[in-house]
Amino acid sequence: MELSVHTFVSLDGVMQGPGGVQEDPSGGFDRGGWLVPHTTEGQLEPVGEWFGRADAILLGRTTFEMMRTYWSQVTDPDNVVATALNTGQKYVVSNTLTDAGAAWGKTTVLRGEDVVEQVRRLREQPGGELQVHGSWQLVRTLHDAGLVDVHRLIQFPVVVGAGKRLFDGGAVPSAYRITESHVAAGGSGAVALTLRRTASGTTGAGEFVVRDGRESTA
């Protein structure tokens, strides 16, 4: 399976608590819900497309508990996101959740110090996509291990100014190629991007030079 990461992100890279004031107040974060005033009808349609591609969903504990609280209440059979989360295969990374505490449809708890290897084995299984949603700490771990094949983002035209960022200091350098991009419906200016990894451990490097009076690269 391909491992894909799905994120709502601000202009300054913040991914913490986009959907509610108390969605993720960890670290004293008090700017939650920043996405909501900037959404318009049709703007989040790509999210349904994302979940429609999932063979399995992989979450960190905080995101798992937040999603379970909200999405287990959505019983609309036409809601693709709810169907994927409530009935599809899920994996949650946690050393504190019991099997009973992780009860939500088909959920398996990944425990232990070898989470990267457990995810690597899942990724090696046949199928379509193993999708990560939210799950800031897990995303960073998988990125640094070189396991993320695809990032799908919706970037909103807002600067949050604080909070957990998708990539902050110390992230392993990587290069991606944009394979899809479009301005989301509704006129708010949010941009949906799909990026496929082309290199891990380096961005590549070069410089601009002038040769024979012409600008060039080297």
Across the structure, where does each feature detected by a protein language model lie?
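Enzymes that bind and transform nitrogen-containing heteroaromatic metabolites
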Residues: M1-A218
